[in-house]
Amino acid sequence: MNCPIIAAPEHFLPTSQSVPTAVRPALTNLTLSLGPIIGLGIGRFAYALVLPDMRDSLHWSYSAASFMNTVNAAGYLLGALIAAQLAQRVGGLAAVRGGTLAALASLAVCAMTSDFAALSLARLMTGIGAGVALVAGGALAARVALAQPARASFVLSLFYAGPPLGIVVSGLIAPFVLQAFGPGSWWIVWAVLAALGAVLIVPLLVMPIPASAAVPETRADRVSLRPMAICLVSYFLYGAGYIAYLTFMIAYVRDLGGGAVAQSAFWCLIGLAGFSTPWVWRRVLALDRGGRPTAFILTVNAIGAALPSLGHSPAMLALSAAVFGIAFSTVTTATTAFVRFNLPQSAWPRAIAALTISFGIGQTMGPFGVGAITDAMGSLTYALNVSAALLLLGAAMAAMQSKLKRTDRAS
């Protein structure tokens, strides 16, 4: 697949003397992160908060409930596949805006219907919008980060900190809305989150687009992806493993007797831990240009997913949320850094697209497969065990990915 380069302007923010030059790339990527905040942090992950109420009110099985995340992941994969071409046509920032608007509109649709097919289509659209926003935004963020080579990994990770922040926001709202309005109020949660998203999107929409933001008529280099095949498999396993945990963990907490406060605290812990990752992992990401940073982060991720199997106390659940959260959003940063370190800039779109496809297939298969296992076994504990096993296997694979040689990069 030959993908176009998604170019980023040197500055998205106004060149005001009040904004120091060293700060502009960080602020730019934080503003770009509003796309993933709405499309992923709220649009995808908040579903876990309303899943128990939707499942009870709409009389769904776990397989049916998990299908909503499966179709969302399929939409994400589709959005990721069209993101580069869309950005080539309309510009990278315009693609991020359009994808975020599509995700926001689909949140409103979720508040308007209880029909399974209509909800599935809305979840599909959320995924498409999120995929466009994340991939187009990720390419822009990677280019923005080049303005500060010494802090490039940190500046890039600010963009990928968007989903954890969205998790915190939804965690502070959804459980208490459900508690206030009672069973069957899942649609009110979607309405409130859609209204919140309409406020959050404003800075992204008013960000100026200078003439330098135009996408050049340049095509990406054809680079063999075979040398990074292990990385692709590892990312597939990560996609399948992490989404299973995030899909069912709130239902697990509720089944243990956790009320709104417990559910909110658990979810916010995941998000807060995830938001801290740019500072926690910056040295790890810079240590090695092969797969070892990804392997280390995935191992921590797997430990977090496995902890609930060792005990059900509030302290153990809180530890699980913190450990899982501090690792899960950094895997994408690590794989993007692997591409940036090992391939020429003109090959980034093709490599990132391949990683996105691998990840997308994994997270499409993960929820439905784990949901079917849960229905068959009758316990969410099996879902968490499968999640941890997939993440640990992904870590083992990543550890075998070596730094690409010059001949690999040029092949």
Predicted regions, residues:
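C-terminal membrane-cytosol helix-exit motif in multi-pass small-molecule transporters
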Residues: 175, 194-214, 397-401
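Extracytoplasmic gate region of multi-pass secondary transporters
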Residues: 48, 227-268, 275
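A late C-terminal transmembrane helix in Major Facilitator Superfamily
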Residues: 342-377
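Conserved MFS/SLC helix-loop-helix module at the cytosolic interface between two early adjacent transmembrane helices
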Residues: 79-114
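Helix-to-loop junctions at the C-terminal end of transmembrane segments
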Residues: 79-91, 277-289, 375
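Paired small-residue
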Residues: 106, 117-125, 315-323
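Helix-breaking motifs and short loop linkers at transmembrane-helix boundaries and internal kinks
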Residues: 59, 91, 112-117, 311-312
